[in-house]
Amino acid sequence: MKLIKKLIILVLLTNVISACDAFLAPDKDNIFSESELIKDPSMAEGVLLNAYSNLPNSVNFTEVATDDAVSNDNSNNYRLASTGGWMATNNPFNTWAGSYTNITYINLFLTIVDKVEWSNRSDWQNEHYKERLTAEAYGLRAFYQFRLLQAHAGYDESGNLLGYPIAAGLITVNDDWRSYPRASFDDCVNQILSDLDIAIAGLPDVYADAPNDNTIKADYDKVYGSRFLNRINRRAAQMIKARVLLLAASPAFNPANDLSKWEAAANAAAEVINVNGGLNSLVNNRLEYYLNENNADIIWRKDYTNSRNLETDHFPPSLYGTGRMNPTQNLVDAFPASNGFPISDALSGYNVNAPYTSRDPRLDKYIVYNGGKVKNTTINTIDGAKDGINMVAGSSTRTGYYMKKHMNQNVNLTPGNLISQRHFQTL
């Protein structure tokens, strides 16, 4: 009997210890092997979707670093950069870490895309899924490389025009970055264009459902249908190509003024315009494209969001905003008269006593000036008004002007009656 009791106790202790081991054992982490990724198409696609989730989702007001605008925020990074505070630890133009993180996701995806069964419904779906996702990956990689080129290209101490280290393959933590020196500017441009050519060849013009009489409608919609709206498409890739070529032709990177580069940029831009309907299809009112969900001129944008962040930052203080970005007189004077002549030309008819009348209509749409309106409210920036120069610390204009562009006039910041509105962010 005593032996039986001892055996029972031993079994119970063994079970308790096993239970403790199971309880104390760490759960499986969120890191998956390649073999696990390729078994699950949703998980494999998620690697690429990481690069989508990190696309820019707001407006960067870099004008504060130029003579076109100032900020009333003493800690604004662009203000600091323009006043001697531009450092490696405080670089608002930096896209290095973010771009390479996304390029790494993309390169990882490209190593597995051919190994995944993307659809078991039909061979057509499987092959076209793979083709489209591969093209998306190359298009996104080109986009992030373009951001690197914009932010980090320049001349070294020897006068060589350099770009960024080209990472065309997967780089791991065990790789030595010293084996990836900065490539020449031209090599970077060629790498981006090569990626874009692959993207353009494999992407649809737009994502849209097939007509009902299409014999492969079910298959087509599954791969190229409207549910993929806002993913990179052929037109977006062509648009990026045009911008890359324009950057390469610009005086900053084309000091010899090679006209063939300008020609290439012009031809690429014309191609984008033509595939989007041509010049005659441009929307007549292009002043507020960022407020219109269905503006045909927008080639690629992110999903709209309901928010009031922009208005909170930039409405005048009388409308409960903090008036962060203030256009300068230099920018205001750049808007010509309504007849097209610069206001410095006598033929413009510019009246110094009525400086905002008979001006280019974009002035009223983009900038709040004294006597201008926001939300049908007249804004007074002189005579000691609340919206006047430096009247409210950290909220009032420093120049006599407020920003109006990108603001949704239907947003209400009145305490107790807050109203958010949609904003459409173009890429």
Specify the residue positions occupied by each region the protein language model found.
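Membrane-proximal, proline-rich intrinsically disordered regions
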Residues: 20-66, 285-288, 335-357
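Conserved, well-structured interaction surfaces
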Residues: 45-46, 53, 77-155, 175-208, ...
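Polar, glycine-rich mid-to-C-terminal structural blocks
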Residues: 243, 249, 272-355, 361
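Flexible, polar/acidic helix-loop-strand segments at domain edges
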Residues: 350-426
